[in-house]
C-alpha cells in the first residue's frame, strides 16, 4: 500500500491568505479551509473560513466567518474547539446554535 504524503499543518499564513486571487478551497490543516469564490456580480472575490469534519457518520461543513471578521489565528482556535467537540460525538453546528441561543437570553 502506498503511503500518502503528510499534509502540512498550518499551511496558510496571513500573507498567503491576502494574496490568494483565484477561486478554490485552500486547506490549512486541522479541518480548517479557506474558501475563495467569485461574488455573484463577478467583480471581486469572497473569502471565508470553513471547518469540515465528520460527526455521527456525516460530513459537516461549518462556516466560521469572513476573513475580514475572523482572523487566521481566530479561525484556528475555533477549528480546534469544534474539532474537539466532534471527537466527542457532538455536532459542532448544533453546539454553536445552542451557544448563540444561550447568549441571547
Q: Can you annotate each of these PLM segments?
A:
Residues 1-105:
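Basic/aromatic DNA-contact patch characteristic of tyrosine site-specific recombinases
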Amino acid at each position: 500500500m502506498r503511503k500518502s504524503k503528510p499534509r502540512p499543518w498550518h499551511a496558510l499564513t496571513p500573507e498567503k491568505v491576502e494574496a490568494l486571487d483565484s477561486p478554490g478551497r485552500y486547506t490549512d490543516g486541522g479541518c480548517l479551509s479557506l474558501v475563495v469564490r467569485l461574488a455573484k456580480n463577478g467583480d471581486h472575490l469572497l473569502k471565508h473560513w470553513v471547518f469540515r469534519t465528520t460527526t455521527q457518520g456525516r460530513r459537516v461543513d461549518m462556516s466560521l466567518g469572513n476573513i475580514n471578521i475572523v482572523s487566521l489565528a481566530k479561525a484556528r482556535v475555533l477549528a480546534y474547539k469544534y474539532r474537539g467537540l466532534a471527537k466527542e460525538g457532538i455536532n459542532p453546528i448544533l453546539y454553536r446554535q445552542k451557544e448563540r441561543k444561550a447568549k441571547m437570553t
